[in-house]
Amino acid sequence: MTPGKTSLVSLLLLLSLEAIVKAGITIPRNPGCPNSEDKNFPRTVMVNLNIHNRNTNTNPKRSSDYYNRSTSPWNLHRNEDPERYPSVIWEAKCRHLGCINADGNVDYHMNSVPIQQEILVLRREPPHCPNSFRLEKILVSVGCTCVTPIVHHVA
């Protein structure tokens, strides 16, 4: 994810959190939660909106079925955590250890490896507190790619 997209995602997470709080969605409360009615409870959050690459050129005609057409195809798996926002993140898992050759067969002379990206999420802290979150980075597999294997030669 580019720095501009990361900032945008962070802003969207904060706006979503505000919408959840304003909507009054009931979430089971942990007795150790900070009291949002307390005068010392923070009412504002500073956010750096330094967005890079505002003009992202996306071609809507390009097919997005890369996960099937890749020489290193992958499946998407649901990663769910109710203490995180967003609570559901779809992660890529490589289908094969090797890569698909031109004949459509798995070639074990190459390796299929996940492509990982750090993203920002909101984590409830302490757990089960509806109005208390901390920003957290997590590593997510977003696709797979084909690489040459690392070979160690013994002398």
From Swiss-Prot:
The keyword RNA-binding does not apply. N-glycosylated. Found both in glycosylated and nonglycosylated forms. GO terms for cellular component: external side of plasma membrane; extracellular region; extracellular space. GO terms for molecular function: cytokine activity; protein heterodimerization activity; protein homodimerization activity. Keywords: Adaptive immunity, Cytokine, Disulfide bond, Glycoprotein, Immunity, Inflammatory response, Innate immunity, Secreted, Signal. Residues 1-23 form the signal peptide. It is found in: Secreted. Changing residue 69 to A: Impairs binding to IL17RA and IL17RC. Disulfide bonds join 94-144, 99-146. Expressed in memory Th17 cells (at protein level). GO terms for biological process: adaptive immune response; apoptotic process; cell death; cell-cell signaling; cellular response to interleukin-1; defense response to fungus; defense response to Gram-negative bacterium; defense response to Gram-positive bacterium. Transmembrane segments: none annotated. Induction: Induced upon differentiation of CD4-positive T cells. Up-regulated by IL23A-IL12B. Up-regulated in peripheral blood mononuclear cells upon West Nile virus infection. The keyword RNA-binding does not apply. Glycans are attached at residue 68. Homodimer. Forms complexes with IL17RA and IL17RC receptors with 2:1 binding stoichiometry: two receptor chains for one interleukin molecule. IL17A homodimer preferentially drives the formation of IL17RA-IL17RC heterodimeric receptor complex. IL17A homodimer adopts an asymmetrical ternary structure with one IL17RA molecule, allowing for high affinity interactions of one IL17A monomer with one IL17RA molecule (via D1 and D2 domains), while disfavoring binding of a second IL17RA molecule on the other IL17A monomer. Heterodimer with IL17F. Belongs to the IL-17 family. Effector cytokine of innate and adaptive immune system involved in antimicrobial host defense and maintenance of tissue integrity. Signals via IL17RA-IL17RC heterodimeric receptor complex, triggering homotypic interaction of IL17RA and IL17RC chains with TRAF3IP2 adapter. This leads to downstream TRAF6-mediated activation of NF-kappa-B and MAPkinase pathways ultimately resulting in transcriptional activation of cytokines, chemokines, antimicrobial peptides and matrix metalloproteinases, with potential strong immune inflammation. This is Interleukin-17A. The gene is IL17A.
